[in-house]
Swiss-Prot record:
Gene that specifies this protein: mdtC
The entry's keywords: Cell inner membrane, Cell membrane, Membrane, Transmembrane, Transmembrane helix, Transport
Protein name (record): Multidrug resistance protein MdtC
Periplasmic compartment residues: 30-335, 380-388, 454-467, 876-894, 971-984
SUPFAM superfamilies: Multidrug efflux transporter AcrB pore domain, PN1, PN2, PC1 and PC2 subdomains (SSF82693), Multidrug efflux transporter AcrB TolC docking domain, DN and DC subdomains (SSF82714), Multidrug efflux transporter AcrB transmembrane domain (SSF82866)
GO-annotated cellular components: plasma membrane
Membrane topology: Multi-pass membrane protein
Domain of life of the source: Bacteria
Chain segments annotated as coiled-coil in the UniProt record: none
Organism lineage: Bacteria, Pseudomonadati, Pseudomonadota, Gammaproteobacteria, Enterobacterales
Chain segments annotated as transmembrane: 7-29, 336-353, 360-379, 389-411, 431-453, 468-490, 853-875, 895-917, 948-970, 985-1007
Amino acid sequence: MRFFALFIYRPVATILIAAAITLCGILGFRLLPVAPLPQVDFPVIMVSASLPGASPETMASSVATPLERSLGRIAGVNEMTSSSSLGSTRIILEFNFDRDINGAARDVQAAINAAQSLLPGGMPSRPTYRKANPSDAPIMILTLTSESWSQGKLYDFASTQLAQTIAQIDGVGDVDVGGSSLPAVRVGLNPQALFNQGVSLDEVREAIDSANVRRPQGAIEDSVHRWQIQTNDELKTAAEYQPLIIHYNNGAAVRLGDVASVTDSVQDVRNAGMTNAKPAILLMIRKLPEANIIQTVDGIRAKLPELRAMIPAAIDLQIAQDRSPTIRASLQEVEETLAISVALVILVVFLFLRSGRATLIPAVAVPVSLIGTFAAMYLCGFSLNNLSLMALTIATGFVVDDAIVVLENIARHLEAGMKPLQAALQGTREVGFTVISMSLSLVAVFLPLLLMGGLPGRLLREFAVTLSVAIGISLVVSLTLTPMMCGWMLKSSKPRTQPRKRGVGRLLVALQQGYGTSLKWVLNHTRLVGVVFLGTVALNIWLYIAIPKTFFPEQDTGVLMGGIQADQSISFQAMRGKLQDFMKIIRDDPAVNNVTGFTGGSRVNSGMMFITLKPRGERKETAQQIIDRLRVKLAKEPGARLFLMAVQDIRVGGRQANASYQYTLLSDSLAALREWEPKIRKALSALPQLADVNSDQQDNGAEMNLIYDRDTMSRLGIDVQAANSLLNNAFGQRQISTIYQPMNQYKVVMEVDPRYSQDISALEKMFVINRDGKAIPLSYFAQWRPANAPLSVNHQGLSAASTIAFNLPTGTSLSQATEAINRTMTQLGVPSTVRGSFSGTAQVFQQTMNSQLILIVAAIATVYIVLGILYESYVHPLTILSTLPSAGVGALLALELFNAPFSLIALIGIMLLIGIVKKNAIMMVDFALEAQRSGGLTPEQAIFQACLLRFRPIMMTTLAALFGALPLVLSGGDGSELRQPLGITIVGGLVMSQLLTLYTTPVVYLFFDRLRLRFSRKNSKPVVEI
């Protein structure tokens, strides 16, 4: 009593405290960063190594395996995967959430150093690492085009100057430059000319390497001067290499230009990049795992004027893709939804209280509670994101509930003629415990979320804390500011209302009278209500089992990502044509704004595409509908497939798969994996629950298998090393020398001129110089025949792995897909030597599925404990919790009605309903207990009176929560995929709960009261001594 009086009788102090909370909140709001979702990125580091010309199997055994053994000893590694292709290996290390990325990077470098001695010689550079996840979609893509500059020159400028500058911006983790490669001097050998001159390929390589050296020459000095010695020991251009003497034939000099074409070109000619049908260099920018995407993009945009100033006029720099506009639009939509929710909630209060002054009180209390929450969010290191703003939107209904309960009870005393200050004190004292019970039990719902681990726990923690803080501030405001404003602003009123207010008043009275009549009937038919209650419990169980489930709602971010997978024997020239064909099909779609893509490198039969869609307001279809439409057109392209998926704000794992979800096969036997993977992939492709099924196991690439006759080689004076060196020199794009320039280092690349290696007959022109200096054709000691070989070799941990990726057809949930996969694996009878498990997002979904029920039960148990402590009773918390089954039925039926799967967002809605619907029971039980204690009423009379007295605040609080959540259901635009499941769950649960709990709660209250009396009578019987 004294606590409440302290604030009621000191209005200036109370107002200043509220103002201080508001000012701190405004300051926190201005300082909060902006993000699509809470920070949930796993720390990921990518290790890269190259050995030009090495086969995928060689890369896997000689490069990947030593590195994996060393990297696997690092503490905190959650998952390690690797992919080895022609000449390159990439190892992805995913660390635990609590691992610092910089500390992990130091451990990775130490592991690379430890494995260095085990790696093969001939690697052009040491393995390197990057602190970025290659499977993440770029946060921004910049393109460089030019009418006069070559692709190699553009690439050099982009990688040497632009990429270096962008990489220094805070938050940037990796700048991947694609579309070409660095400039190089390319030496295209003529095998016949070499044979005629008696010059071996090794001799050419050694001559070039010896002619281009960079060594210190020292200095000469006398007593006065000092001269630095400088020589022309370096060759920098193709024109300087052409006259190089590489051999003497009968005293005549054989120059490099006599036996080869020497051109200024690029290191790897098998690279291509395009933007909207124009050749382009792509700068794909990815953020650090812990970086804020909006702040990083803003930093890049702020740097763009400086970048454009340093670019020559012949180069055009454009932003091809930017993730930030859709994120900002989504957050703006949430903020508008929040404002609408506040307005609707205040409208509900006005309709019930029919007083402008009374409505002004919650109109002040709600903003103070919500704005004050921003200060706590800033101190906790949170961000303004979809989930935290959704928490505040839902909190609108909660925070007004506390104010409504206090305000309505004070208003009731005022209507009875009590003086304002006395009514404020008396009304607050009567409901103070009720408000505390409602708030503490609501916060208790979120305690299990705070203890939840993994990605779901990290994702929901910010939501739970934000909502809990808002409820806590609301509790303080409702017991201090609200009664103070009631005591000083409201006046005692007469029983009659003004004529213009009679309509709403009569409706409320009529509803209350109708409720009283129906409640009497219900209390006389308790068994029927009991059957209905048990039916809702059973229906909950059935609906939860039957409803489709998924991890996170599929978002429409306005960006699509596509992976091209062509025939494994396709050439680079044909692959570049496929890229152009796919880009044309996509560019012609009316919903597409921009298309960029690239192909080449170590994976000749693959490519990547990034598609920016028009803003939501300029297109009618969702991203998934556009994908469905394009899938039909793209399927008509022969010899290649393009797999499209919508870019999501959450992507788990480091696998760069061609679909959203992955199922990984592991085996210690590569042969067993290669035998069973095609069978499993074929079976999964036939499932209607899956779409775009594809695999990263590609073991049907065309290979020419050379078989050496070692006896003949020994007799001819040729060793295996010389033969392998011949093949590497001829067909491996071998980097044989380095050209040093002020801004970068470039390579001299040697291979047989493509004009002489168009088919297998090129092998017949190859020869080796034996120990006697004679030219021995390759065909003398080797036979060759075509065979199949893998284009890539993949590992997970130290086991051979193959990942089958898939998307979901429209109308199919992730739970239906995973169940179908598990059922298929059982039906196929896959041996124990091949193990299957879900990866990435599908794996997290499986883990979340296992913990969902535990989480709901833990929340209910926590609420029960809190209520039991507050009421000092084992029974009354059960009465209050009896409201939950009806809310669960309503929520699940609403999700089914809207064809929305049960996702992590819907789980949040269920958790919120646990807190919301019990408020009705708390208000009933509190007044019934008080009536029994102080009024001497029977349980039947007490609960009946409590239901009637609390009918108006129950209707007000429920409608406030309902109208607070309704804008989430009706919202459209960017980000609505996240908001709608939450709104649907809450609105459905509230409607069903309001219809049932007004009747089931009093029945359950009486049931437990009779049960209590029965047990108390048994315990009170005298003990009979025998």
